[in-house]
Amino acid sequence: MKVHYPDCTYVALYHGEVKNAKTDVGYVHENGADTSLFEGVDFGILGHIHKRQCIKHNGVPLVYCGSLIQKDHGENLSGHGYVVWDVESQNYEEYDIQNEDYGFYTFKINSIEDIEEDKENIINL
């Protein structure tokens, strides 16, 4: 396509798992689409994985914008929002949406003493 339309910007829109995409719990997708699928694009806007991240293919950013808010216990409360792209410069900015008032809180409690001594820890902020 670039050969026929060299002045155009090529944007990949993809909803699915890409190899090496990570989830909030640290799982790394090994069986997703290979990044070579995006050969020839200027940047990629990806969805499906709720963790905001950028995966590069030959220097080309393939960006999961993440989810607007926390969706389940496996996700952190923070780090959610949206991404705004500048198509001409092919750069993007990340914007967080603050939503710590509502969500799933996961606590680490090692013993009953942790509760009695107010030492329980929230582990998904």
Can you annotate each of these PLM segments?
Residues M1-L125:
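Extended recognition/assembly regions associated with phosphoester-bond processing machinery
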